[in-house]
């Protein structure tokens, strides 16, 4: 990954967290953005949030225009990528892997 793309994603992550914190919806302004992946050319960004609730993801989709407007004003960019919000389940996967490794370790201890 090149440095420009990393910087862009990092800046966008910070701006998105600020934008969410400024919303009037208590469910949205307490969300955590964990990761942002931008496509080439900054046309599209995949935004990972710590929520698996479809209702919250739907609210984010409805608020996309306000969020993009905030990003444009705060960043000074000419255009903002189209945002797609998805649930970040990497923490759940990591917890499952840890549980599996613990079971394996217990099995070895019993031998």
UniProtKB/Swiss-Prot annotation:
PROSITE patterns xrefs: RBFA
Pfam families: RBFA (PF02033)
Keywords on record: Cytoplasm, Ribosome biogenesis
Signal peptide (UniProt feature, chain positions): none
Compartments reported by the entry: Cytoplasm
Xref: InterPro entries: KH_dom-like_a/b (IPR015946), RbfA (IPR000238), RbfA_dom_sf (IPR023799), Ribosome-bd_factorA_CS (IPR020053)
Cellular component terms per the entry's GO annotation: cytoplasm
Keyword Cytoplasm: yes
GO biological process terms on file: maturation of SSU-rRNA
NCBIfam families named in the record: rbfA (TIGR00082)
Assigned protein family: Belongs to the RbfA family.
Function in brief: One of several proteins that assist in the late maturation steps of the functional core of the 30S ribosomal subunit. Associates with free 30S ribosomal subunits (but not with 30S subunits that are part of 70S ribosomes or polysomes). Required for efficient processing of 16S rRNA. May interact with the 5'-terminal helix region of 16S rRNA.
Subunit structure: Monomer. Binds 30S ribosomal subunits, but not 50S ribosomal subunits or 70S ribosomes.
Descriptive protein name: Ribosome-binding factor A
Source species: Helicobacter pylori (strain HPAG1)
Gene name of the record: rbfA
